Amino acid sequence: MTDLIRQDAAALAALIHSGEVSSVEVTRAHLDQIASTDETYRAFLHVAGEQALAAAKDVDDAIAAGSVPSGLAGVPLALKDVFTTRDMPTTCGSKILENWVPPYDATVTARLRGAGIPILGKTNMDEFAMGSSTENSAYGPTRNPWDVERVPGGSGGGSAAALAAFQAPLAIGTDTGGSIRQPAALTATVGVKPTYGTVSRFGLVACASSLDQGGPCARTVLDTALLHQVIAGHDPRDSTSVDEPVPDVVAAARAGASGDLKGVRVGVVTQLRGDGYQPGVMASFDAAVEQLTALGADVVEVSCPHFEYALPAYYLILPSEVSSNLARFDAMRYGMRVGDDGTHSAEEVMALTRAAGFGPEVKRRIMIGTYALSAGYYDAYYGRAQKVRTLIKRDLERAYEQVDVLVTPATPTTAFRLGEKVDDPLAMYQFDLCTLPLNLAGHCGMSVPSGLSADDGLPVGLQIMAPALADDRLYRVGAAYETARGALPAAL
């Protein structure tokens, strides 16, 4: 069983589809690992053992009958608790949705089920995906398997920790300003933020609608590509869904694994390096750039001057959208309901419920957003931030006229200690410095492990960025780099 949980998803799929092992065996092995380790790591908010084993048996029966539902059929997965699931709770890490079981599946959930992928359970996250450490979860923080006194990143730290702790071979996250890529960097896993609109947001509980994007996470680039292919594609139920062909990311990953990057133009973003970055992170990044050069890539410096303003623009746009989206949690139709004893008006019930149900970071962002959208301040704050967003997108478009992909460190430092930044929101926000420009532009990005920092022995991530609808470039470059880098130590 120990051997099974350490296999990558592609290898597990091959074993299951050939009949050497059953999906039930693989799923049970991962459920056993969750049972024996999650008291330490707290990666899961809900474990759906019975449902996962039933789904695994269905796959085994289909294979016995000569039918394989998909390339990943039978390989179990951990799902971030922000996607609706009709048969298990969806809490978004918040007390206001405690024990809420939605009446429908998100499109991503439905596509996973349709592909025969057993869902092991729902993973921990910062409340409503607001945070960079998973410390904002109403159900307690997730701990990093590399060092249990440190954070696994956020908001999707549960999914990344589950991968690093061998509790799951695959996971799904969401990325609003780096919530897939940043935890991947801190846990030595692979995480991809797809092009905005290429993975359906139907059934994804919204944080910031123009920024949120679901995406795949795994321990290898190929596994991530295989999962990406399952969840991507147009969805008429999502008004922001892009009706364009999805690039063949699996073929790109397989091609990249050959290690040849001749003719690929790589840009190093000048603004995302230097002061404020941990020396060990920069040393790892510089070594990764040298490796890309050795693989045949043409590496040049690229300037994106408006990245300097990305952080303040993001933290005006995001809270503004949060303020609007979270207004729907009014205690009228579902979720927590406080003060409903006949002595309070509907408005009082709403106020009492929101006061008790939302955590401090969510309240902070609602207040900032409400202020930024208020009459007299809209143009000065939200309107100006949207103009900066346009300038950042133009910076990237100009950069891609010169290069095929851009590379940066995925995070300024390695994983920080639990509690270190909780009382300093600005320091926490600055941790997203490298990742959030991509979300403002709607482009795609990947974090792939680039080794361990010489400073503290903790994981470091290389961020690869590409234009909209060029997700295949991420996989080609990421797989080539992964092959050249070689195997890394595991957290456990």
Swiss-Prot record:
GO terms for molecular function: ATP binding; glutaminyl-tRNA synthase (glutamine-hydrolyzing) activity. PROSITE patterns: AMIDASES. It is an enzyme of class 6 (ligase). The active site is at 80 (charge relay system), 155 (charge relay system), 179 (acyl-ester intermediate). It catalyses: L-glutamyl-tRNA(Gln) + L-glutamine + ATP + H2O = L-glutaminyl-tRNA(Gln) + L-glutamate + ADP + phosphate + H(+). The keyword Metal-binding does not apply. Its EC number is 6.3.5.7. Keywords: ATP-binding, Ligase, Nucleotide-binding, Protein biosynthesis. It comes from the Bacteria. Belongs to the amidase family. GatA subfamily. Heterotrimer of A, B and C subunits. This is Glutamyl-tRNA(Gln) amidotransferase subunit A. It comes from Mycobacteroides abscessus (strain ATCC 19977 / DSM 44196 / CCUG 20993 / CIP 104536 / JCM 13569 / NCTC 13031 / TMC 1543 / L948).
